[in-house]
Amino acid sequence: MSKQDEQANRLKTRLGFKWHNPTLLIQALTHSSCVHENRGHGLCHNQRLEFLGDAVLELIISEHLYKMFPDRTEGELTKMRASSVCEPSLAKVARGLDLGRCLRMGRGEERSGGRERPSILADAFEALLGAIYLDQGLEISRHFVLNCLSSIIDDVVAGRLDRDYKTELQEILQQSSPDPLTYTIMDESGPDHDKTFTAGVIYKGKVIGKGSGHSKKEAEQQAAKDAFQHLEGMGKSGHKSAGPIR
């Protein structure tokens, strides 16, 4: 038995329920790099489960915040949800579950520090949630999420977490114009197991901020931060006349 299988068994025990389809857990803990390095072995990576888990997570947290804070506005709830389920928050939870040591991944990804990469850990948490939802249903999924994220939500409410610049930037610019913000990946560099993405945030046809990161989400957040800080420098972060800044 591999070290990853041993860790997965410990995780299974820690979760505290009997899996109806244990292959879902295996899939949730299989990174795409493992599949790419072992073609022909019938392995399935966790990206589809991540897609599902992302939606389940948003539903559970949205409902929880809606019930927990009946006096908060839609904008406030959106901001709280974004901070609760952002990449750093989910990576922190994944570390608490020791998901990094459970993951099956390719040698190249592992050598480059993939087991500790926030984007991989956050994606693994969402994939695990997707697997739990398919195997156990919504109620157990809700219990799992709220148990894992309760301290994160407390930190969000108390203002102890990093700011969500994407949400803040959108709120500022929409005060003066309904024009949407869009994000685009402008560049990718590095090998498949250690990519760096450069994102741009576009407003009224102009790139108003750029940022880089080891995941698309991180790059977009950095691009939003760049634009937001530029707005602050122009004295517009609390002003209703914000517009294109570059």
Curated annotation (Swiss-Prot):
Domain DRBM: 164-233
GO molecular function: double-stranded RNA binding; metal ion binding; ribonuclease III activity; rRNA binding
Top-rank taxon, per record: Bacteria
Binding residue positions for Mg(2+): E50, D123, E126
Cofactor: Mg(2+)
Family under the similarity heading: Belongs to the ribonuclease III family.
PANTHER family in UniProt: RIBONUCLEASE 3, RIBONUCLEASE III
Functional summary from the UniProt entry: Digests double-stranded RNA. Involved in the processing of primary rRNA transcript to yield the immediate precursors to the large and small rRNAs (23S and 16S). Processes some mRNAs, and tRNAs when they are encoded in the rRNA operon. Processes pre-crRNA and tracrRNA of type II CRISPR loci if present in the organism.
Name under which the protein is recorded: Ribonuclease 3
Gene (UniProt): rnc
